[in-house]
C-alpha cells in the first residue's frame, strides 16, 4: 500500500514538477529551433523530461495487452513484472481518471502552439508522440475487448495480444532511447503526424 500511495503521489505531481523544472531551466537554456545539432546541445535535463510522458502509453499497453501475456513469460521476467510493474499497473487501472488528466495536461501545457510556457522542441515532440501512442493503444485495446471472450483467450487471440503488446513496448523503448540521445524518433505514420502538429520541427 505504501508503494502504491508513493507512486500515486509521484504520478500526480510529475507534470507539475516537470513544468517547474522547465520554467527554471528556460532561464539558462537557449532554445534553438534549428535542431540539426540537437545531439550535442540538448541538455540532459531536457532529454530526461522528454521521456516522462511515455509512462502513459506504457501503462495503457500493459492494461490492454500486457497483463494477459506477461504472466506466461519465462520465470525470470515474472518477479520484475509482479514486484515493479504490477503494483503500478493496479494503481493506474483503479484510477482511470489519471490517464485522462495526464492526456489533457500534456496537450494543453506542453504540446499546444499556444502553450502557457515555452517548451523545448524535443519535449513537445515526445509529449505529442506519447499522446498518439496512448490513443493507438486505447483504440486497439477497445477493439480487442470487443471480441468474444472465447477468441481473446484462444491461441490466436493471445498471439494478437502478444503482438500488440510488443509493438507498443518496442515503439516506446525506441522513442525513449532516441530522446535520451537527444534525437527525434521516426515511427511510420505516428512520427509524421507529430511533425504536422509540432511546428518548427527539423530533422
UniProtKB/Swiss-Prot annotation:
InterPro entries: Tic20. Pfam families: TIC20. Keywords: Chloroplast, Membrane, Plastid, Transmembrane, Transmembrane helix. This is Tic20 family protein Ycf60. It is a multi-pass membrane protein. The chain crosses the membrane at residues 2-22, 51-71, 84-104, 131-151, 153-173. PANTHER family: PROTEIN TIC 20-II, CHLOROPLASTIC. It comes from the Eukaryota. It is found in: Plastid, Chloroplast membrane. GO terms for cellular component: chloroplast membrane. Belongs to the Tic20 family.
Amino acid at each position: 500500500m505504501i508503494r502504491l500511495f508513493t507512486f500515486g503521489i509521484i504520478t500526480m505531481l510529475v507534470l507539475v514538477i516537470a513544468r517547474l523544472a522547465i520554467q527554471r531551466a528556460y532561464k539558462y537554456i537557449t532554445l534553438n529551433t534549428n535542431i540539426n545539432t540537437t545531439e550535442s546541445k540538448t541538455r540532459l535535463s531536457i532529454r530526461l523530461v522528454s521521456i516522462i510522458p511515455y509512462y502513459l502509453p506504457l501503462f495503457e499497453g500493459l492494461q490492454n495487452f500486457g497483463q494477459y501475456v506477461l504472466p506466461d513469460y519465462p520465470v525470470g521476467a515474472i518477479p520484475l513484472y509482479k514486484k515493479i510493474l504490477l503494483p503500478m499497473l493496479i494503481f493506474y487501472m483503479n484510477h482511470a481518471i489519471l490517464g485522462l488528466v495526464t492526456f489533457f495536461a500534456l496537450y494543453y501545457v506542453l504540446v499546444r502552439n499556444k502553450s502557457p510556457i515555452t517548451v523545448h522542441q524535443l519535449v513537445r515532440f515526445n509529449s505529442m508522440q506519447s499522446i498518439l501512442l496512448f490513443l493507438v493503444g486505447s483504440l486497439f485495446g477497445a477493439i480487442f475487448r470487443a471480441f468474444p471472450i472465447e477468441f481473446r483467450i484462444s491461441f490466436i487471440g493471445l498471439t494478437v495480444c502478444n503482438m500488440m503488446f510488443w509493438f507498443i513496448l518496442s515503439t516506446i523503448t525506441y522513442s525513449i532511447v532516441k530522446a535520451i540521445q537527444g534525437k527525434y524518433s521516426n515511427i511510420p505514420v505516428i512520427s509524421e503526424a507529430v511533425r504536422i502538429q509540432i511546428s518548427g520541427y527539423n530533422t
